[in-house]
Amino acid sequence: RDKIRSKSKQIAGMQLGMALEGRLGIIIDSTARDVEKISSQAANLRSIGYDIHMVFVNTTLEVALERNRSRPRVLPDAVVINSHKQIQKNMGRLQRIFGHRNFLIVDNNKYGEDVNPMVHKKIRGMISRAPTSYQAVRWIHRELEKRKRK
């Protein structure tokens, strides 16, 4: 199992490297518990010209506990409570890292409600904006110049 996991991580790392080299859009899925790691990833992406956004899917502690209990692989309540507290505590810092304009909070407390269409619409709006960073604009210009020469 560890061998498979190690190989999977290696392949994922290579794919990420290629995506970053081509300046493709990427999605990082996280629990938002490790704000230092997220901050580091955000800074690295910004440094190469990425505009970054965060979708923060929020639930109450009660809903988190209830959903945990209905999963096939249940975590102890103490782990869920601790994680939820940490994530809620990190919300303000994450908003500062990503900026108000690029931080979307989704309320995911209602059972049976499909939040995906609403989230998809908001994300499309965020990513359809033209890049604003100097690095991104410069990279796009260089790539367009390369195409003209071919």
Segments and roles (model prediction):
Residues 20, 27-28, 54-59, 65, ...:
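Generic hydrophobic secondary-structure signal
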Residues 61-150:
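Conserved GTP-binding G-domain of TRAFAC-class P-loop NTPases and closely related GTPase folds
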Residues 33, 46-67:
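Conserved phosphate-donor/acceptor-positioning beta-strand/loop module used by diverse small-molecule
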Residues 1-46:
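Conserved nucleotide-sensing/catalytic segment adjacent to the nucleotide-binding pocket
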Residues 2, 54, 70:
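Short, flexible active-site loop motifs that bind/organize anionic cofactors or intermediates
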